[in-house]
Regions:
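Solvent-exposed, non-transmembrane regions of membrane-associated and secreted proteins
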Residues: 1-164
């Protein structure tokens, strides 16, 4: 679902029908940093949208489930998570930064991200020209804290050549 300004994604499925699981919502698919919001349900429903993401704060699970795929209309993008943090009101880092005016601004943003990271994969070296995905969900169904994952695109598959 692409953002249309409302919060319908919290309570509807892809078909617009009521759903306690909601639907992931993408902010601006053409920016350098796609921001995806999803519901943490926590109502005893397993594997629903982003409910399990908070478990990636465990280092073993972080490295085990570090790769994910984003399926778009005409392509599939492969991403690797390199950072996870939990945001509360005191977090001084603009994880919602969509584009960067210069390489210096980008590397400053990455340095700020490292400062607040619970886990940061030092094997990945994000570059100014890379594309990213930021995923945000609630820490749990009752908290105002947010789990933030930052991932870099490592590969893209087109639907035409079926290489995926």
């Amino acid at each position: 679902m692409i953002d249309a300004g409302g919060k319908e994604y919290l309570y509807q499925n892809f078909d617009g029908q009521p759903s306690m699981c909601g639907t992931p919502m993408i902010f601006e698919t053409k920016s350098k940093n796609k921001i995806i919001y999803g519901h943490h349900v926590g109502y005893g429903v397993e594997n629903v949208v982003f409910t399990k993401l908070s478990e990636l704060t465990d280092k073993k699970l972080f490295y085990e489930y570090q790769t994910f795929y984003l399926c778009m209309q005409d392509k599939v993008e492969e991403y690797r998570v390199f950072l996870i943090t939990v945001k509360n009101k005191e977090l001084d880092w603009n994880y919602q930064q969509k584009d960067f005016t210069s390489a210096d601004k980008f590397y400053e943003w990455i340095a700020d991200a490292k400062k607040v990271a619970l886990i940061y994969d030092t094997d990945l070296k994000p570059k100014f020209n890379d594309d990213f995905v930021t995923i945000q969900t609630c820490l749990d169904a009752y908290s105002s804290k947010r789990v933030i994952l930052l991932a870099v695109k490592i590969r893209e598959y087109t639907m035409e050549n079926d290489s995926f």
